[in-house]
């Protein structure tokens, strides 16, 4: 009993200690597991070697994780399953109500009821404090009902969040494609300009102007002037 209590305290701590079966993870056992896995030996299921292989994922029921119980098929429990009184009209927000404003209307009603209950609670505390537990329980039930309706929106919120994320990724990819297209256009324009300049150089040399061969035989200041002259005629 004492051992189980310590294990539960460890599971609920911020940094839980290593599980009790961690002592079986020795070099010798790890080597045995590798040999058995390679030979498909059924002795692998025997203790303590079975603790060295991860269990198969659960397909149904519940599982424990850090001291809490989680359902494999996660679904929102009803207020009746939780033992909470349902104060809103459940039939109005199901079926056709999912597409209408029934949920919003019920939330507004519950919010107004919560404000009224809080005002009554503050008044009771000054006049009749012994009625505090009943009124406080009423406030608690109203809050749980509000949260339950909001939690029913979670699947819709998840779908819309996924749609928004995917749309953002599509927009980013389109923007990247557009940036690449603009860069390609700039490269084409640059190549076109350079091609025209080379054509002008060829035409310049064919007409008997100052050529690069003539520049080789000129030195000093005269050479600089000839280069400037060539650049001006090309541009």
Curated annotation (Swiss-Prot):
It comes from the Eukaryota. Component of the Mediator complex. Keywords: Activator, Nucleus, Transcription, Transcription regulation. This is Mediator of RNA polymerase II transcription subunit 7. The keyword rRNA-binding does not apply. InterPro entries: Med7/Med21-like (IPR037212), Mediatior_Med7 (IPR009244), Mediatior_Med7_sf (IPR044888). One of its GO terms (cellular component) is core mediator complex. Component of the Mediator complex, a coactivator involved in the regulated transcription of nearly all RNA polymerase II-dependent genes. Mediator functions as a bridge to convey information from gene-specific regulatory proteins to the basal RNA polymerase II transcription machinery. Mediator is recruited to promoters by direct interactions with regulatory proteins and serves as a scaffold for the assembly of a functional preinitiation complex with RNA polymerase II and the general transcription factors. One of its GO terms (molecular function) is transcription coactivator activity. Belongs to the Mediator complex subunit 7 family. It is found in: Nucleus. The keyword Kinase does not apply. Its main location: nucleus. GO terms for biological process: negative regulation of transcription by RNA polymerase II; positive regulation of transcription elongation by RNA polymerase II; positive regulation of transcription initiation by RNA polymerase II; regulation of transcription by RNA polymerase II; RNA polymerase II preinitiation complex assembly.
């Amino acid at each position: 009993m004492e051992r189980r209590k310590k294990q539960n305290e460890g599971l609920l701590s911020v940094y839980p200690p290593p599980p009790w079966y961690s002592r079986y993870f020795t070099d010798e056992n790890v080597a045995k597991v590798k040999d058995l896995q390679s030979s498909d030996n059924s002795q692998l299921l025997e203790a303590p070697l079975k603790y060295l292989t991860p269990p198969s994922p659960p397909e149904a029921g519940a599982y424990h994780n850090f001291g809490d119980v989680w359902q494999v098929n996660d679904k929102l429990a009803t207020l009746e399953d939780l033992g909470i009184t349902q104060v809103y009209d459940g039939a109005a927000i199901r079926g056709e109500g999912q597409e209408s404003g029934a949920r919003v209307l019920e939330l507004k009603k519950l919010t107004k009821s919560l404000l009224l209950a809080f005002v009554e609670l503050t008044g009771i505390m000054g006049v009749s404090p012994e009625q505090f537990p009943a009124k406080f329980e009423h406030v608690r039930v109203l809050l749980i009902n509000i949260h339950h309706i909001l939690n029913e929106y979670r699947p819709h919120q998840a779908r819309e969040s996924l749609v928004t994320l995917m749309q953002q990724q599509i927009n980013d990819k389109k923007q990247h494609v557009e940036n690449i297209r603009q860069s390609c256009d700039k490269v084409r324009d640059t190549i076109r300009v350079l091609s025209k300049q080379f054509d002008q150089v060829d035409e310049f040399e064919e007409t008997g102007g100052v050529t690069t061969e003539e520049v080789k035989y000129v030195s000093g200041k005269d050479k600089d002037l000839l280069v400037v002259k060539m650049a001006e005629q090309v541009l």
